[in-house]
Every structure is written in C-alpha cells, then in structure tokens.
C-alpha cells in the first residue's frame, strides 16, 4: 500500500472511451508512466448538452481556488462546446453549452476544446479547432475529408460566465487540430503541441511550437514531426518533474501508450496526491470491479492476481457474455486486460 502525504504530486488523465456517449472517465498515476482507471473504469458524468450529446476530448483545468473546470466536444457538427465544474471531480455542476461559434453560421464544427490557465493574467484560455469554408488558406484534401480545413480559435474568461469575443488563435499554412498547451517549469515558456491534419498527402502527425507569453500567440513555424510514420492525434502533454511526456492516440491502431485500454483523447494534469487518494478511497464511485461481472475466479501467478469472469458490459469486445480477465498486484486496484 502506498502512503501519500498532502503536498505530494499525483496525476490524473481525463478521457473518453468508445463513442463517448457514456461520458467522463478518469485514470490516475504517481509517476506519469503507469496509469490505472478510477471508478472501476466507469463514467463519472454523462453528457447532456449538444445535439449529439457526446463527451469527447474532455479537458480539465484546476483553478487556484481548487475548482475543476472542464470543457469537451459535444458533437461532430456543432457550434458549441460543453462546460461543467466540480470541487471533487465526482459531483458536477449543471452542464452548459458555451456558444463559441454560434456567430459563424457556416462553421462546421468545434473540436477538441482545451483549457489553459494563464497565471500572470489570471485568465482562462479556451481554444478549439473549427472549419469555416473559404476562410483559411486552402489545402489539398483527400476525398473523405473534402471541405475540412481547420484552424484554432479561442475565447478567454475569468469566471466561466462571461467570455471574450471569439478570435483566431493559431493560423498556420496547414489544417490543424488538437492543440494542447503546457508550461515548461524549467524554461518558463509555453509549449503547444498540435496535429497537422493535412490529408493529401497525409501528414497526420504531431508538431511543436513555443512562446514566452500566450497573449503574444505561438509561431506558426512549427517543429518537424515528433511522431513516427503512423497516424497520431489527441496529444496530452504533461511535465513530471523536468521530463515532458506527450501522450497521444495512435488512432489507427486503437491505442494510447502507458494508459488504460480503450482510452481516447483527453488531458493529463497534476494534482495534489490527496485528491487521487480520495477518489481511490470512495468505494461508492470506485468499486473494485465494475458491475455485471459474473462467475468470478481468482488465481495468482508470481506477484500478480488474475480475476476471471464473464461480463455483460462492452469493453470493446463486441458482444455480451464474453470471458474477461482483470489483474492486480494488491487485490485493491484492478486493471482490465
């Protein structure tokens, strides 16, 4: 059993699974490399806003007063984003729709909104990807992505009740989505990771750009790809000490690295370890094994316990009544295999 003291750092990952209709999922880690799902892998919050009622790409930011603010993609083709807040990541406020692109009747979408709190100005930046036909420098597209040419837009707020006018945030010479910002604690500048979304020829890779101050914007001259010859998206940058980790979705392979199975685009963020401990300890919201597990049998091999059973839940296996395997080192924290 790990003893954790107040003031120590732990890490949370907000994410969605499958089609995102079941809502917000959380995972935790103490080192940024080994992650376990909370709440037995079940959702903490079911989406209730937007025409499709999705909760894709949940981005969470903790305010100086301890409140957690979250924004998310509510639809594939909507001009709003979802918003809710919480003091404990378990009980959430009424969900709201922020009409960030309602003033643009031709806007196709509002994808992957992200939150960043700028300490010097005590201001929250919310930024996302939108296509507005004819608005941006044209790029060649594949037939399947015809008409999609994204740029990053943003609004600011101090209270999540009033918002600035929507403005352009990042306008490179390529279609761009999935922007995510993290502060470098050593250099004290800001790093933004973005996806080059060009489809003809396909790029589908992650690039980096840096700035000293967010209000001055980010250079549109970006780095060479930091990912390999596979399609990547959904970057989630996180500093663990002086080391920068960038988690991302190898979406054609249907996997993230070093995180729970089935995870999709979200945000990694640091919290006081006591917050993670309270989430783990709350058995009302974190059962050892999710509901609907039948005929359990446990065996131990080496230092690992394996629990075998059948389930009616869909873990991406495609059918009910499928045999499943969970494993644990301590008989308390179980991960799905």
Annotate the PLM regions.
Residues 1-337:
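Carbohydrate-active catalytic/glycan-binding domains of CAZyme proteins
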């Amino acid at each position: 059993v790990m003893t954790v003291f107040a003031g120590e750092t732990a890490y949370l990952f907000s994410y969605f699974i499958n089609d995102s209709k079941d809502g917000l999922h959380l995972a935790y880690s103490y080192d940024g490399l080994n992650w376990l799902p909370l709440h037995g892998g079940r959702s903490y919050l079911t989406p209730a806003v937007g025409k499709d009622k999705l909760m894709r790409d949940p981005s969470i930011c903790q305010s100086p007063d301890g409140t957690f603010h979250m924004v998310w993609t509510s639809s594939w083709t909507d001009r709003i984003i979802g918003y809710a807040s919480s003091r404990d990541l378990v009980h959430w406020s009424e969900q709201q729709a922020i009409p960030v692109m309602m003033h643009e009747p031709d806007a196709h979408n509002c994808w992957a909104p992200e939150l960043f709190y700028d300490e010097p100005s005590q201001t929250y930046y919310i930024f996302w990807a939108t296509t507005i036909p004819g608005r941006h420098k044209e790029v060649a597209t594949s037939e399947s992505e015809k008409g999609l040419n994204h740029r990053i837009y943003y609004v600011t707020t101090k209270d999540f009740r009033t918002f600035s006018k929507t403005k352009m945030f990042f306008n490179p010479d390529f279609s761009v989505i999935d922007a995510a910002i993290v502060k470098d604690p050593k250099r004290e500048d800001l790093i933004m990771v973005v996806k080059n979304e060009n489809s003809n020829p396909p790029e589908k890779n992650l690039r980096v750009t840096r700035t000293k101050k967010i209000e001055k914007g980010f250079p549109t001259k970006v780095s060479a790809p930091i990912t390999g010859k596979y399609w990547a998206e959904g970057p989630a940058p996180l500093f663990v000490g002086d080391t920068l980790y960038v988690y991302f979705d190898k979406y054609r392979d249907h996997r993230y690295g070093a995180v729970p199975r089935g995870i999709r685009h979200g945000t990694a963020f640091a919290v006081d370890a006591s917050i993670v401990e309270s989430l783990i300890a709350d058995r009302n919201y974190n059962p050892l094994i999710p509901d609907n597990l039948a005929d359990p049998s446990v065996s131990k091999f080496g230092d690992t316990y394996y629990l075998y059973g059948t389930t009616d839940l869909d873990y991406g296996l495609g059918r009910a009544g499928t045999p499943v395997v969970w494993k644990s080192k301590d008989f308390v924290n179980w991960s799905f295999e």
